A protein has these predicted regions:
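Alpha-helical transmembrane segments of multi-pass integral membrane proteins
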Residues: 11-23, 78-87, 111-124, 152-175, ...
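Interfacial helix-loop-helix linkers and transmembrane-helix boundary segments
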Residues: 32-38, 60-74, 98-103, 182, ...
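Transmembrane helical segments that form the transport core of multi-pass membrane transport proteins
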Residues: 168-221
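N-terminal signal-anchor module of multipass membrane proteins
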Residues: 1-51
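Alpha-helical transmembrane segments
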Residues: 36-49, 103-118, 184-200, 266
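Membrane-interface helix-loop-helix junctions at boundaries between adjacent transmembrane segments
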Residues: 66-158, 282-287
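C-terminal ends of transmembrane helices
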Residues: 1-2, 55-67, 125-128, 207-215, ...
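Alpha-helical transmembrane segments and their membrane-interface junctions
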Residues: 87-101, 165-181, 239-258
Length: 287
């Protein structure tokens, strides 16, 4: 890859990082959490985030990678781009200032880094960039075919659902509106919301699927089996991702089981939308 092409890919990654982190830039609760969030939990978020970004680089890196080291470097580059762009944007809109304590500055940047890093990695696909030589290299064709096979595998689908769920839920979890909704809905409304979330996830996973993927999924078993293995498993991952983020942002403290369940159900609703759409974004080049 030439320097000009690499610079162009970095530019796309920068745009993707800002675009994906934009909701958090404009969220007042995020500004407060940068100061109040437990630093140990933010470190935990980074520890969980990094291997997921390395794995995501395999599916959607912003440059062509050929081995584990390349994917690791890709992930670190995405984190660096997301952190740098996040710091600049927060500084421009007055959320950061040199007078603030260093811990507060680091906390605010850390919160926007995860969605920004995802955006940096997905920018190549979102901006429809096609690298030169991808169609002319037979070895590249074999590699692409192998990657497509992996992307269609069961665990790859679950992984991509988890990434999408974490990204969307992270943009909602810090807000007070999410807590307010959970308090004002009844148990029956919570149950209805959970069922609607399951239905939405199932529709997103199977609606407008490519014919080969439909045949592959149906070949895995009956439609009930597919519903359990994909949709129910996906919703469970969305719920776990929601619980993890609620814990990261201190929403689980002094909270009863019933209230916590409602928090999870409410946060899982946007999470399932991200889970269902994540595979569509990564799988676009197969169309």
């Amino acid at each position: 890859m030439g320097n000009a092409e690499y610079a162009r890919d970095l530019g796309r990654a920068l745009v993707g990082a800002v675009l994906f982190a934009l909701p958090l830039f404009m969220t007042m609760e995020m500004w407060q959490l940068g100061f109040t969030a437990d630093r140990g939990r933010l470190v935990t978020l980074f520890v969980v985030m990094l291997p997921m970004l390395i794995a995501l680089s395999y599916f959607a890196g912003f440059e062509r990678a050929f081995g584990l080291l390349d994917h690791v470097l890709d992930a670190f580059a995405a984190v660096a781009i997301a952190a740098a762009s996040g710091a600049v944007v927060l500084l421009l809109i007055g959320v950061l200032s040199p007078a603030q304590p260093l811990q507060e500055i680091i906390g605010k940047i850390a919160i926007v880094t995860f969605p920004g890093a995802i955006g940096a990695l997905l920018a190549d696909k979102q901006l429809e960039h096609k690298r030169e030589g991808d169609d002319d290299d037979d070895d590249g064709d074999d590699e692409t075919h192998e990657q497509e096979e992996i992307e269609r595998s069961y665990f790859a689908r679950l992984f991509l659902m988890t990434i999408g769920a974490l990204f969307v839920a992270l943009n909602v979890a810090p807000t007070e509106e999410m807590i307010l909704i959970a308090f004002q809905i009844s148990p029956w409304q919570s149950l209805a919301l959970a069922l609607i979330s399951l239905t939405a996830l199932h529709a997103l996973l199977f609606w407008a699927e490519f014919e080969e993927d439909e045949e592959r999924m149906r070949g895995d078993g009956s439609m009930f089996s597919v519903f359990v293995r994909y949709t129910c498993a996906g919703y469970a991952l969305c719920a776990l991702a929601s619980l993890f983020l609620l814990w990261i942002f201190g929403r689980t403290e002094n909270t009863g089981l019933a209230e916590l369940t409602e928090f999870i159900v409410v946060l899982a609703f946007p999470a399932v939308l991200g889970a269902g759409l994540a595979q569509r974004v990564v799988a676009e080049r197969r169309g």
